[in-house]
C-alpha cells in the first residue's frame, strides 16, 4: 500500500506544558499587548500601595490610643481583608496580564478566585458593620453599651468572615457551580458546572445587594436624625440669642462666687453614652488672677458629635468608593458577555483592584486622628498599646463609653469617685426622708480645713498626660481637688450639682439659682483657687484652668483645658494624716459636734471647733443606688428615725463608723 497512515504520539499524549497551561483561543487576541502591559503595571502598583497602606493602618490602630474604639475593630478587619487580597490575589493577576494567560495550574485557579471573592465579601460586610455601629450610636445610643461589648464585637467580626467564605464552599467543592478558567476573559472565575448551575447570581444578591441596601437604609436614618438635631440646635441658638445680655447667667460674680445652679445645663447628646449627662462650666483663671465671665457652653457635646459625624462621613466615603469600584465590573460582565470591548473589561478589573488600596487614602484625607496615628508609626514616635477592644483597666462602663466617643486631644479627663471632708469628727447620725431630701455638709467659717474630692484614676487610658515641664515638687500619689466648705467664706466658689433619679443614674435636674433646699440636690462647694494637679500646680495662680465638671452615669469627670507652656512650680496642698482612734468609744460620746435634720436636709456642723487639734478626714462616698449595697456592708448605718416631713419617696442617709462618715442617696424604684 502506497498510502500509509502515520500516527503521531503527540496526538495521543499532549506535551507536559499543556497540563499546567490553559492556552487562550485564537480569538482572544482582542486584548492588545499595550493594554495588558498597562493593566499589569497598574495591578502591581495597586498591590504595593495596598500592602503598605493596609499594613500601616493595622499597626497604627493597634499602637495609637486615640484611634482605638469600636469602629476601629471593624476597620482592622477590613484592612486585613484588603491586605490578604493585595498579597495573595494581585500578584497572580498581575502575572496573568504579563503572560497573557493563566500559567499557574488548576489548583491555584480554584483557590485564587475563592480568596478574591471571599475578601470582597468580607470588605463589604465590614463596611456594613461599621455603618450599623454608626447607626446605633447616633439613633439608638441607649443600646450602644449593651450591644458593643468585647465579646460581641469578636462575634460580629467572625460572622463576617465565616459568612463570606462559607457561601463559596459549595462552589469550591463543585456542588454549586465551580471555579475554573474563563477563556473569554483569560482569567479564573466562577463557571457553570456540568448541570449548568452557577452561584454568581446568589452570591451577588447575598454578599453585595443586601449589604448595600442595609447600608443605604442606615445612612438615610442617620442623615434624618442629624438633620432634625441641627434644626433643634438652630432653634435653641435663636432662642438664646434673643435673650438680653443682662438676663444671661454669668460664670462668676464680682465676689468670685458662682451663682448657685447658674451653670447647670441638661444635655441629651446623640453619642455612645447610654445615659444623660450634665456639665458645669468653671470660670478659668486668667494670668492676671481675675476671673473672666463666660456664657453657658457645652463644647464637650459639640466635640463629641463632631467627631462621631466625622467618622460617619468617613465610613460613607469608604462605602461609596467600594460601590464605584465594584459596580463597573458587574455591569460590564452582564452587558458584554462575549467580550466585544476588551478595554472595558481591563478597566473594570483595575477599578476592582483599586478598592483594596483606596481605604487608607480615605483615612488620611478625612480623619485628623488617623493622620497623627500614621505619623506616629512612620516616624517611630513612642506610643503605648491599649487593652483589647471594649475593655479598660478597671474603668467603669460610663468611663469606657466616654473614651469611645473620641473626645478632644487637648483635654484631660479624670474620674472623681470619692469625696472627703475635714470637718472635724462629726458625731451623730440621722436619716431625712421626703420627696427630694438632700444631704448638705457644712462647716463653720472658723474651720479652715477644706473638704476634698479624691480623683481616682480608674485606668491609664482615661487621663491625658501633660507634656509640660514638671516642677521640682513631690506631689501626693492621687490628684486632689480641694473644695472650700459652704459657709460665710466669700472667696469660695459654690457649685450646685442638682441631681435627680433617671433610670438608676444621677443626671441633672435643671437650673437652681436658689439657696440649698430639699429639692435642690447635692451641694458641693469648690474653690477655684485650690484646685491642684500633680506637676501642674494650683489653678488659682493662672497655671491651668478646669473648665468643666461632668457626671456621666456613676462617675464625676473633670475636664481640663490645655495648659500654658510654663506653669509656675507650686507645691501640693497637704493635709494631716488621720490619727488612730484614741479610745474605743463612739465619736458621739467624745466630740461636741452634732448632726441635725432641718428642713428635710441633713446638716453636719460643729458648735465648738478646735483648730489646734488635728482632725481626721471624714470620707463621703457619693454613689449611685447600685453601689449602695457595697457601702452598706462596709459601714455601719445609722438608725433611721421616723420623719413626718412627707412621704418616704427619697431618703438621704448619713452614717458614721469610727472616723468615716458615709453619705448615701437612696431612691425608690421606677
UniProtKB/Swiss-Prot annotation:
GO cellular component, one term: plasma membrane
Annotated keywords: Cell membrane, Disulfide bond, G-protein coupled receptor, Membrane, Receptor, Transducer, Transmembrane, Transmembrane helix
A Pfam family reported for this protein in Swiss-Prot or TrEMBL: 7tm_1
GO biological process, one term: axon ensheathment
Entry's localization field: Cell membrane
Cysteine disulfide links: 109-188
SMART domains: 7TM_GPCR_Srsx
Biased composition (Pro residues): 564-584
Chain segments annotated as transmembrane: 41-61, 70-90, 112-132, 153-173, 203-223, 314-334, 346-366
Keyword Cell membrane: yes
Tissue: Isoform A and isoform B are expressed in the head. Isoform B only is expressed in the body. Expressed in embryonic glial cells that are involved in ensheathment and insulation of the nervous system. Both isoforms are expressed in glia that insulate the larval and adult nervous system. Also expressed in the germ cells, the gut, and the heart.
Disordered, as annotated region: 258-302, 461-490, 562-622, 636-670
Biased amino acid composition, Low complexity: 267-279, 585-598
Topological domains annotated Extracellular: 1-40, 91-111, 174-202, 335-345
Disruption phenotype: Mutant flies display an increased sensitivity to cocaine and nicotine exposure. In contrast, sensitivity to the acute intoxicating effects of ethanol is reduced.
GO-annotated molecular function: G protein-coupled receptor activity
Membrane topology, from the record: Multi-pass membrane protein
Annotated family: Belongs to the G-protein coupled receptor 1 family.
Summary of the function given for this chain in its UniProt record: Isoform A and isoform B are required in glia to regulate the acute sensitivity to cocaine and to continuously maintain the proper blood-brain barrier (BBB) function. A moody-mediated signaling pathway functions in glia to regulate nervous system insulation and drug-related behaviors. Galphai and Galphao, and the regulator of G protein signaling, loco, are required in the surface glia to achieve effective insulation.
Listed name of the protein: G-protein coupled receptor moody
Source species: Drosophila melanogaster
Species classification: Eukaryota, Metazoa, Ecdysozoa, Arthropoda, Hexapoda
Amino acid at each position: 500500500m502506497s498510502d500509509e497512515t502515520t500516527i503521531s504520539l503527540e496526538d495521543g499524549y499532549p506535551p507536559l506544558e499543556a497540563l499546567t497551561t490553559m492556552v487562550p483561543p485564537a480569538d482572544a487576541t482582542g486584548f492588545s499587548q499595550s493594554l495588558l502591559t498597562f493593566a499589569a503595571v497598574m495591578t502591581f502598583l495597586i498591590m504595593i500601595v495596598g500592602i503598605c497602606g493596609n499594613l500601616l493602618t493595622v499597626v497604627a490602630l493597634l499602637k495609637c490610643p486615640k484611634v482605638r474604639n469600636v469602629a476601629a475593630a471593624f476597620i482592622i478587619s477590613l484592612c486585613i481583608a484588603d491586605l490578604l487580597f493585595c498579597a495573595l490575589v494581585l500578584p497572580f493577576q498581575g502575572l496573568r496580564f504579563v503572560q497573557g494567560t493563566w500559567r499557574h495550574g488548576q489548583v491555584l485557579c480554584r483557590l485564587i478566585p475563592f480568596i478574591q471573592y471571599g475578601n470582597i465579601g468580607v470588605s463589604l460586610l465590614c463596611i456594613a458593620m461599621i455603618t450599623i455601629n454608626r447607626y446605633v450610636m447616633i439613633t439608638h445610643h441607649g443600646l450602644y453599651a449593651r450591644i458593643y461589648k468585647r465579646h460581641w464585637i469578636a462575634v460580629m467580626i467572625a460572622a463576617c468572615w465565616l459568612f463570606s467564605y462559607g457561601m463559596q464552599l459549595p462552589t469550591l467543592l463543585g456542588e454549586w457551580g465551580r471555579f475554573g478558567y474563563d477563556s473569554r476573559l483569560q482569567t479564573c472565575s466562577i463557571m457553570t458546572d456540568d448541570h449548568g448551575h452557577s452561584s454568581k447570581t446568589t452570591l451577588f444578591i447575598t454578599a453585595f445587594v443586601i449589604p448595600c441596601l442595609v447600608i443605604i437604609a442606615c445612612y438615610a436614618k442617620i442623615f434624618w436624625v442629624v438633620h432634625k438635631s441641627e434644626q433643634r440646635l438652630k432653634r435653641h441658638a435663636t432662642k438664646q440669642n434673643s435673650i438680653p445680655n443682662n438676663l444671661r447667667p454669668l460664670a462668676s460674680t464680682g465676689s468670685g462666687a458662682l451663682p448657685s445652679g447658674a451653670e447647670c445645663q441638661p444635655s441629651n447628646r446623640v453619642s455612645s453614652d447610654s445615659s444623660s449627662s450634665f456639665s458645669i462650666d468653671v470660670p478659668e483663671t486668667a494670668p492676671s488672677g481675675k476671673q473672666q465671665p463666660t456664657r453657658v457652653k457645652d463644647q464637650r457635646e459639640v466635640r463629641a458629635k463632631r467627631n462621631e459625624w466625622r467618622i460617619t462621613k468617613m465610613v460613607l466615603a469608604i462605602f461609596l468608593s467600594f460601590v464605584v469600584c465594584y459596580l463597573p465590573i458587574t455591569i460590564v460582565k452582564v452587558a458584554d458577555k462575549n467580550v466585544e470591548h476588551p478595554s472595558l473589561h481591563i478597566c473594570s478589573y483595575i477599578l476592582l483592584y483599586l478598592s483594596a488600596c483606596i481605604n487608607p487614602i480615605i483615612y488620611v484625607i478625612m480623619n485628623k486622628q488617623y493622620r497623627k496615628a500614621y505619623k506616629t508609626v512612620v516616624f517611630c514616635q513612642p506610643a503605648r498599646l491599649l487593652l483589647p477592644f471594649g475593655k479598660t483597666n478597671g474603668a467603669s462602663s460610663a468611663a469606657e463609653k466616654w473614651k469611645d466617643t473620641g473626645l478632644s486631644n487637648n483635654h484631660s479627663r479624670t474620674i472623681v469617685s470619692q469625696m472627703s471632708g475635714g470637718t472635724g469628727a462629726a458625731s451623730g447620725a440621722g436619716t431625712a426622708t421626703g420627696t427630694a431630701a438632700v444631704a448638705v455638709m457644712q462647716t463653720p467659717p472658723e474651720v479652715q480645713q477644706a473638704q476634698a474630692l479624691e480623683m481616682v484614676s480608674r485606668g491609664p487610658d482615661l487621663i491625658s498626660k501633660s507634656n509640660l515641664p514638671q516642677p521640682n515638687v513631690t506631689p501626693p500619689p492621687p490628684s486632689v481637688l480641694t473644695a472650700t466648705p459652704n459657709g460665710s467664706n466669700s472667696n469660695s466658689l459654690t457649685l450646685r450639682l442638682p441631681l435627680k433619679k433617671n433610670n438608676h443614674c444621677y443626671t441633672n435636674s435643671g437650673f437652681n439659682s436658689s439657696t440649698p433646699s430639699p429639692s435642690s440636690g447635692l451641694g458641693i462647694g469648690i474653690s477655684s483657687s485650690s484646685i491642684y494637679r500633680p506637676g501642674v500646680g494650683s489653678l488659682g495662680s493662672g497655671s491651668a484652668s478646669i473648665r468643666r465638671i461632668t457626671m456621666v452615669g456613676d462617675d464625676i469627670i473633670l475636664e481640663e483645658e490645655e495648659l500654658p507652656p510654663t506653669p509656675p512650680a507650686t507645691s501640693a496642698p497637704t493635709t494631716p494624716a488621720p490619727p488612730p482612734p484614741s479610745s474605743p468609744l463612739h465619736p458621739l460620746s467624745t466630740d461636741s459636734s452634732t448632726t441635725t435634720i432641718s428642713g428635710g436636709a441633713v446638716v453636719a456642723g460643729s458648735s465648738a471647733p478646735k483648730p489646734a487639734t488635728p482632725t481626721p478626714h471624714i470620707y463621703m462616698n457619693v454613689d449611685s443606688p447600685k453601689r449602695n449595697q457595697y457601702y452598706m456592708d462596709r459601714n455601719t448605718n445609722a438608725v433611721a428615725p421616723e420623719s413626718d416631713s412627707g412621704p418616704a419617696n427619697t431618703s438621704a442617709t448619713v452614717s458614721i463608723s469610727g472616723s468615716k462618715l458615709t453619705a448615701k442617696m437612696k431612691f425608690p424604684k421606677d
